[in-house]
Regions:
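Conserved active-site alpha-helix within GNAT-family acetyltransferase domains
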Residues: 89, 101-106, 111-137
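Short amphipathic alpha-helix that is part of the acyltransferase structural core
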Residues: 1-32, 130
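Short, basic/aromatic recognition patches
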Residues: 32-38
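Conserved acetyl-CoA pyrophosphate-binding loop and the N-cap/start of the following alpha-helix
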Residues: 82, 86-94
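A short helix-loop-beta-strand connector motif used in the catalytic cores of GNAT acetyltransferases and
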Residues: 39-50, 129
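Conserved beta-strand in the GNAT
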Residues: 50, 56-65, 72-77
Length: 138
């Protein structure tokens, strides 16, 4: 059975499992296995949701926000062995519900790697007049 939780103070096991999810999603490549970085990510997020199977974290997602008007959902991923079960959709639903209950009504995200089919049924639409951009630092 999959359970969903808001995480704000991860323990060492949580941190290891979250690092593994970042690596599995290929967002970090061979980047640092830095538990303190992950702890700051979790604590600095407006909300951070994990999906658990028993004691194992099998999915996650988070929102960043100014806490007043806008929020961005990011880092939504599910372990390959647990995909296609609605876990990512439930993570996003829980994040959106929290953001809306906190009064944040503009919620954005960048759908990567053909993930638009996940977000469309949850009410997200493409923005024809916008282009996602980023600036990388070294």
């Amino acid at each position: 059975m999959i359970t969903f939780h808001f995480l704000s103070d991860p323990d060492a096991a949580d941190l290891r499992q979250i690092i593994a999810l970042y690596r599995d999603a290929e967002w970090w490549g061979s980047g640092p296995d830095d538990p303190e970085l992950v702890r700051r990510i979790v604590r600095g997020s407006h909300c951070f949701v994990v999906a658990r199977s028993g004691t194992s974290i099998v999915g996650m997602g988070r929102a960043i926000s100014d806490g007043a008007s806008d929020a961005w959902i990011q880092d939504v991923t599910v372990n390959l062995d647990f995909r296609r079960r609605g876990i990512a959709s439930e993570i996003v639903r829980r994040i959106v519900a929290r953001l809306e209950s906190d009064g944040l009504m503009w919620i954005g995200l960048v759908a990567e790697r053909n993930t638009a089919p996940l977000y469309g049924p949850l009410g997200f639409e493409g923005m024809a007049d916008a282009l996602p951009m980023r600036r990388r630092t070294t």
